[in-house]
Amino acid sequence: MAREKDLAVAFRSTVVAPGLIVELAKRLDSLSCLSHVFVPEGSQGGFTSIDICSACLAISKRLRIGSGIIRILEHDPGLLARRLLTLQQLSDNRFVLGIGTGRAGSDPKLTIRAMLDRLRLTRESFETFTEALPGVEMPETFIRTLRKGIAKAVIGHSDGILLNFCSPEHVRDVISSLGDARRRLIVSCYLKIFYSKDEATANRMLIEEFAGYDQNPSYHKMFESVGIAQEIGRANLFLRSGKSVRPSENLKRISLANPTKRELASYVTMFREAGVDLPCLYPYFEPSEDAVFKIGKVEEIARM
């Protein structure tokens, strides 16, 4: 279970190169306020999260490090269980399994049931392997969710839920739907922060992220519920016309661009007060930004 002031960070390998993620895990391992590192897997293929996590676990001693998320329906449960077994044995049970459905398809409920069934089969295979290996534990498991229905469906199947790119109000709404079961779940949430040496570039990246998520019906509905859907559309139109755009206060309740230390601390506190147990700072950079800049910003947010 997450401690009261635990903090996580997330690194996507298309934003922070795998070798640099490993270097950051080594640097951050000594920071007691940081408990978890998540490595989200790209939706378009490329580097695999579990392999990057394996390298990070090998050079660290304390941090819990894991996928955040993998699409478990793409994995054979027996083979995945063996990989988890190996990681847990080698890392003293520090691997974290973050999973999701990927594209929900035409029947989201059916896809969610398939995901939970795949997790069950993986766990059963894992437990079969560990009968002769006392002390090796099934990884702490997080399931990515956005809507209340998914959050309620995963109760009893995971240690926590992982929310993404949402407002504190939405977090409260999801948590309130869980009732008494909320006490059995760690609630984590990705808090995306966009950094650049150029302020306009950081703002542009943030608006583009909002515009991209707004194309997803589930996120569009969530944006509508907190009154920012039209605002996102207007900001994106301004951006596409070549005009510079600064994020409004409403958008900054969900994501930040080049925040000051005070702004970042206030942002994290806002989500903790909404009920998030494990805020997960998720820095984004332009591909052209140098490694020194990225390392400096990551160390800055991890020490906030």
Each language-model region and where it sits:
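Hydrophobic faces of well-ordered beta-strands that scaffold small-molecule active sites
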Residues: 5-13, 35-39, 64-68, 95-99, ...
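Flexible, glycine-rich active-site loops centered on histidine and acidic residues
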Residues: 2-16, 74-136, 165-177, 201-219
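Glycine-rich, proline-tolerant flexible connector loops at the mouths of alpha/beta enzymes
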Residues: 35-59, 71, 103-110, 165-168, ...
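Short, acidic/polar
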Residues: 15-29, 80-84, 145-153, 201, ...
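An alpha-helical appendage that flanks or caps ligand/catalytic pockets
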Residues: 112-132, 137, 172, 176-274
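Acidic (Asp/Glu)-rich catalytic clusters
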Residues: 2, 25-31, 53-64, 84-95, ...
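N-terminal beta1-alpha1-beta2 module of alpha/beta enzyme domains
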Residues: 1-60
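Active-site mouth loops of central-metabolism enzymes
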Residues: 5-20, 68-78, 137-145, 193-196, ...
